[in-house]
Regions:
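Glycine-rich phosphate-binding loop used to anchor ATP phosphates in small-molecule kinases
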Residues: 1-30
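Short, amphipathic alpha-helical "lid/cap" segments that border enzyme active or binding sites
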Residues: 6, 99-107
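Conserved acidic residues
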Residues: 16-17, 35, 89
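Small-molecule kinase domains that catalyze NTP-dependent phosphoryl transfer to phosphate-bearing small molecules
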Residues: 27, 57-100
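Short, charged, intrinsically disordered terminal tails
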Residues: 108-115
């Protein structure tokens, strides 16, 4: 499945602008010159509240279990550790900035690099 997904991701990127969430997109597109990757993290208090309000009452433990699955998937297919700041164009702590402002920050970041 990873090989097929990677092929589709690369085809999408070659055909124009796109946004890839997850699926090791940072790794798959690492050789694309106009590739930007972002990592969003948050502290446990923020994640607990967001799990409660936005994800049908998910507990912090459930969220951390999902994160571990993401990390395992990423490491299995890339041989690298998931979430390492140096792998991303920009990392944002969502506990410190409202999500709409984080989105604005990402847009501005890309605009600055494309200028």
């Amino acid at each position: 499945m990873f090989v097929a997904e990677s092929k589709i991701i690369r085809q999408l990127a070659k055909s124009g602008s796109c946004i890839i969430l997850g699926r090791c997109g940072d790794f798959v597109l690492r050789d694309f010159s106009k590739h930007y990757s972002f990592f969003i993290c948050a502290d446990d208090d923020f994640r607990t509240e967001r799990g409660r309000t936005e994800y049908d009452g998910k507990t912090l433990q459930e969220i951390k279990t999902e994160d571990q699955k993401r990390a395992d998937y990423y490491e299995y297919y890339t041989g690298e550790r998931w979430g390492q700041p140096e792998k991303y164009s920009l990392s944002i702590n969502a506990s410190k900035i409202p999500l709409d402002k984080a989105a604005d920050l990402i847009i501005r970041y890309v605009e600055l690099l494309q200028a």
